[in-house]
């Protein structure tokens, strides 16, 4: 079954409202084995909505439209859908009585324009709305096609979809539909183009499962996807491809599916029984925040230093003033001293430090905005896989605005810790 999603509302086009319904409906339909080929956002204009719905019905079996079911003049979805499907609107007395009761129970008088919400295309099925006044509608179209209208507010759309639309689609499939099963592999320390180049042969011949790379902030994700009757069958089909990718790029692969980089680093620290400390300047505590966002992080994280000013670097971390004078705060020697000071003063097993120029000001020709210095100091470890003692430093030039530089720096700091714990830091 091929579906098209239509989202109605000028506020969506203006960016005043985030269209979370698009993500929700796409995910739900994928789980039901329904292919979504198109998504369209259209404003509150009858002519344009008429054209969009007509085109959708010409190329899809199922059209789901959300929004525009309210009582005001710009709520036009019901009327336009009735026109496009050739089904005249008729007042539903039962729906009207229910709506009058809904208002009476809340001590409110029903306005005359609310009667519009009780107009139903002839032959359509009404989908009850337990959260609001706008019922959904399931309207038959030419052939075996159907147009489903859902309210725009997510708090009304989601329960209506789950209670009425999902069971209808499952029954319509005539058995166990093939569902979309995916595995997301998460990489750090490698770019999208380099990863894609190393998988060129696999991507050139992909049929089932499919491979789709997409870039995130300082990360790359690979989505492996197949259709199967259930998750077990799907994951079994994905497993050989995943194993091949891991054999090629396991050094950069930190996790899968919903595991984040802070979770992956925390898992490695916990497995080794080690603790981490942070010393941050330009990131302002972002690395420590991400680490402590993970429940149970107190097992491996105890101390984080935010030393934004040079005075704080000296007093809290013991960075020598002459080092700051000679090299500047954004330098590998200072980053090394920050990491070593955090290691010594926290008692942790490993410490990571970040010092950079996030912008928009502060850059120079020698050290432009985006220059970030990193350092990691480790005490070393013999058991559970030996780790060397020492201090390592590196410098990156990161792109983006102030927040972008800070976020990319935080990702790289965590990636540096991961590399050390896995023995890749050299």
Swiss-Prot record:
SUPFAM superfamilies xref list: CinA-like (SSF142433), Molybdenum cofactor biosynthesis proteins (SSF53218)
Disulfide cysteine pairs (residue numbers): none
InterPro entries the UniProt entry points to: CinA (IPR050101), CinA-like_C (IPR036653), CinA_C (IPR008136), CinA_KH (IPR041424), Competence-induced_CinA (IPR008135), MoaB/Mog-like_dom_sf (IPR036425), MoaB/Mog_dom (IPR001453)
Pfam family, one: CinA_KH
Signal peptide range in chain numbering: none
Protein family membership: Belongs to the CinA family.
The protein, known as: Putative competence-damage inducible protein
Gene name per UniProt: cinA
């Amino acid at each position: 079954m091929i579906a098209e999603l239509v989202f109605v509302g000028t506020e969506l086009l203006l960016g005043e409202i985030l269209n979370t319904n698009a993500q929700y409906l796409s995910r739900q339909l994928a789980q039901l084995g329904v292919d979504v080929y198109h998504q369209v956002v259209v404003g509150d204009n009858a002519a344009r909505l008429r054209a969009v719905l007509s085109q959708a019905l010409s190329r899809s079996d199922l059209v789901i439209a959300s929004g525009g079911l309210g009582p005001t003049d710009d709520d036009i979805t019901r009327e336009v859908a009735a026109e496009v499907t050739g089904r005249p609107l008729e007042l539903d007395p039962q729906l009207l009585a229910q709506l009058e009761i809904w208002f009476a129970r809340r001590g409110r008088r029903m306005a005359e324009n609310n009667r519009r919400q009780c107009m139903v295309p002839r032959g359509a099925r009404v989908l009850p709305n337990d959260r609001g006044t706008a019922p959904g509608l399931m309207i038959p179209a030419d052939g075996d096609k159907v147009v489903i209208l859902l309210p725009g507010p997510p708090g009304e759309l989601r329960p209506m979809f789950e209670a009425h639309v999902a069971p209808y689609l499952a029954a319509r499939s005539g058995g166990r539909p093939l569902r979309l099963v995916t595995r997301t592999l998460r990489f750090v320390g490698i770019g999208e183009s380099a990863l894609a180049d190393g998988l060129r042969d696999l991507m050139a011949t992909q049929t089932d499962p499919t491979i789709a790379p997409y870039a995130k902030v300082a990360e790359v994700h690979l989505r492996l996807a197949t259709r199967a009757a259930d998750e077990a069958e799907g994951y079994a089909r994905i497993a050989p491809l995943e194993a091949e990718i891991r054999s090629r790029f396991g050094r950069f692969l930190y996790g899968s599916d919903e595991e984040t980089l802070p979770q992956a680093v925390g898992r490695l620290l916990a497995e080794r029984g080690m603790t981490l400390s942070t010393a941050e300047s330009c990131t302002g505590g972002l690395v420590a925040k991400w680490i402590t966002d993970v429940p149970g992080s107190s097992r491996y994280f105890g101390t984080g230093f935010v030393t934004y000013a040079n005075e704080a670097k000296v007093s809290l971390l013991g960075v020598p003033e002459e080092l700051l004078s000679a090299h500047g705060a954004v330098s590998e020697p200072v980053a090394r001293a920050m990491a070593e000071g955090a290691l010594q003063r926290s008692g942790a097993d490993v410490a990571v430090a970040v010092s950079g120029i996030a912008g928009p000001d502060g850059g120079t020709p020698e050290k432009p905005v985006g220059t970030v210095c990193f350092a990691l100091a480790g005490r070393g470890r013999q058991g559970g896989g030996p780790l060397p003692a020492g201090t390592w430093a590196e410098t990156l030039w990161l792109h983006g605005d102030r927040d972008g530089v800070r976020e990319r720096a935080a990702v790289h700091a965590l990636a540096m810790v991961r590399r050390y714990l896995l023995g890749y830091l050299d």
